[in-house]
């Protein structure tokens, strides 16, 4: 048994990483509402463990602003004043918010190469919290499917750079109470660059 387990044990690796990213998502339209997000920068923290030459798991946390703009016909106009602004035949409302996301992924990596390509997929939860001082808004909690790919580049032993692209798939946020939900799926693209330390 020792002879069988020994090579696998030698491949076990754990690393921690921090990355900066841009968050890009298009406008969602549905049920008479157009929901337009900002495209903010964010930060992600990761912990990865790989226990054999190919497969491992990851836990991650990310934060970015999640300001939203809503435009359309309101279902209850009386609660839209003074938060909504007339825009032609429709009304407009901006909501300022923070987004926190936690996730868990499986990933496949060619960990024995100097430049290590990887691919990942997993699930998480997205918590969107409007800033204080705004009325007629609500927080959202959304389940998320995450996918991505990238490369780790070893600079010196135990330290390297991580270049990756990630996507988050989830239902579009509905933070403004006066507007109907678009009831659409949103896909957020996140190109990232970061650094890792491998134990």
PLM regions: where:
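Residue-level detector of the transmembrane beta-barrel scaffold of outer-membrane proteins
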Residues: 15-19, 56-58, 118-120, 160-162
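Gram-negative (and chloroplast) outer-membrane scaffold detector with strong preference
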Residues: 46-133, 142-143, 153, 188-199
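Cleavable N-terminal export/targeting peptides
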Residues: 1-14
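Transmembrane beta-strand segments that form the barrel wall of outer-membrane beta-barrel proteins
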Residues: 16-26, 30, 123-127, 168
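Surface-exposed strand-loop-strand hairpins of Gram-negative outer-membrane beta-barrel proteins
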Residues: 23-44, 140-142
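Subset of outer-membrane beta-barrel
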Residues: 36-39, 142, 152-176, 180-188
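Glutamine-centric residue-chemistry signal
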Residues: 11-13, 146, 164
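Outer-membrane beta-barrel translocator domains and adjoining extracellular loop/strand segments
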Residues: 28-34, 69-76, 129-137, 173-180
């Amino acid at each position: 048994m020792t002879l069988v387990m020994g090579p696998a044990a030698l491949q076990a690796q754990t690393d921690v990483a921090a990355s900066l990213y841009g968050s890009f998502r298009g406008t969602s339209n549905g049920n008479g509402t157009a929901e337009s997000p900002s495209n903010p920068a964010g930060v992600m923290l990761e912990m990865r463990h790989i226990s054999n030459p190919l497969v491992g798991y990851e836990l991650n946390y990310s934060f970015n602003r999640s300001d939203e703009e809503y435009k359309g016909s309101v279902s209850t106009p009386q609660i839209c004043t003074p938060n909504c602004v007339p825009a032609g035949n429709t009304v407009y409302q901006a909501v300022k918010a923070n987004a926190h996301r936690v996730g868990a992924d499986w990933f496949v990596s060619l960990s024995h190469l100097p430049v290590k390509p990887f691919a990942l997929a997993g699930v998480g939860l997205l918590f969107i919290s409007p800033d204080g001082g705004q009325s007629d808004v609500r927080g959202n909690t959304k389940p998320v499917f995450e996918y991505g790919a990238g490369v780790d580049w070893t600079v010196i032993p135990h330290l390297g750079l991580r270049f990756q692209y990630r996507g988050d798939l989830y239902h579009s946020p509905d933070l403004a109470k006066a507007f109907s939900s678009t009831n659409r799926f949103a896909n957020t693209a996140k190109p990232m660059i970061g650094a890792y330390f491998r134990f």
